[in-house]
């Protein structure tokens, strides 16, 4: 089913809501076009409390997909979490179906936006950029949904322009879905600037670096290793670099750093995130005592112990602390706080935070993600471990204070790929990469059984179920994923 209308907010810009649009009076000029693109193309890609794809709460893409793997766990037992934590997906499960139910209709909103801005009398260069941003957003959202659910519904412009007619849009084929994603991202990459610096007026908007990063992830999903390498090389031309100290990536003072490919800009009263509120125990001592602490998210002890003790990335994970009650809590004396694992602190404190809401930017994609994907894609495309693949892995590995790998350290391709998977887990936990990585390696279900003790995980759960409401309302014309 398709739902027509525009709703959104984005980045650090004024947000507007367009539930219905009189196209004879809006949009008519460049400002209207910009507002429409901000609402439609950027609306999904935000982190604001309980809103947006990248929120830190129960509706967040990164937190929920990582929670279904060996990386994260949650102490809360309300109705939302068990299906994810135990990989017990059904067509009526809240979290597994929510991303499709919430965001699938935004594909159509972006298609309508492309049509509505095409005829506006404005500077051609600006119009071309806005079209590219909208196509980047559509391709990105389509990729996210495709990764989670497989082929998606793609309504035509004709259907979208006749919202009063009930038209059931079936799921597109795999080939049609991939083509939409690929075409949109390639078109965007041809137009958008490589990157923006924090001082740029358009900082926070989509870039060539983002378009190629998402396209690289699509090709990794499709096992098109050579094409993934090509995309990685394009990102490497965009001017990104690794931040020297891992912990500095995630701080208020270092927002907009050169490692960041895309982040959700958080600003007091506009968009605010709740990671620390979801992680910290009530008795955890913070420099700012006004941060709310709900004692939820954890890093399982088995994953914590997979780090080398010398790994500097452990600096943003807390395995022991002296509580405000004077008691020392750790793995052997967990109390009610560390029984499910260490504290995945990740982000720096917001010194002016007075509630659950922080204005530290939420990381979405960064250069370390691309470099480690490059290492994997290079090895897979050559069917052998190459020096270049080892070098890309070392770019990230040595930043963590660990000794560089040598080519001779790896006795086989599988040995190297295992090292890459481990590195990506240690580097990118909490950033939403693990589920896709494990599926690509054929380990997602195995890990759910081995590390989460799941008795319900099945191979078909590599894809999440579409909401049952979508199937019911379509009278069966929209086909559910196998197994559900």
What does each model-found stretch correspond to?
Residues 225, 384-386:
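TPR-repeat structural position
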Residues 24, 51-74, 152-157, 193-214, ...:
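Short, surface-exposed recognition loops and adjoining beta-strand edges that mediate ligand/DNA contacts
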